């Protein structure tokens, strides 16, 4: 009898653990679906601001984060973080929240980011104005990398070039980079060997729309 009771107790504990795991997975999936829905609603209202129809997929976010050196001194700045998919990948890469500076134009997304990443610094502002915005915010703190989820192809070519030039002028260190993704087969800003180098990663197929990551660094 005692053995049967003990077996029943173990079974109940095992079932309780399994249920907890299933509930956790369901909550996570629901949260991701809710993010997709919220992002899609914002895109429907302001398509030129968001550019993408849905948040970046995890494989693309990991590819973006892989271009960042988490040991580099200074801030990692993210432009247009949206719901924080790339932000989370950067943290998983090893970037401390305290070293993250997130610039988000949409105030609802900015509030969401503050709740999700309470130790990161979140600024509601225009990421295309980093030449004026970043020095005022970062001060003397060096910038290790700038990661961009901005929809560059929705902007004129000169504005795209200016953003890359402004970003690279703010980044310090030999390994510092401006990192951008796009769905197009060509880079959003072409190579300029006199000003910066350009490297494209392999195409990330496991995304809603296949994308590639482009890494810009100042020419030596």
Residue ranges and their predicted role:
Residues 142-159:
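A short SAM/SAH-binding and catalytic strip from SAM-dependent methyltransferases
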Residues 174-183:
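Conserved beta-strand signature within the Rossmann-like core of class I S-adenosyl-L-methionine
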Residues 189-220:
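Class I S-adenosyl-L-methionine
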Residues 72-82:
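Conserved class I S-adenosyl-L-methionine
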Residues 32, 39-70:
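Class I SAM-dependent methyltransferase Rossmann-like catalytic core
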Residues 83-95:
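Conserved SAM-binding loop of SAM-dependent methyltransferases across substrates and taxa
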Residues 109-140:
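S-adenosyl-L-methionine
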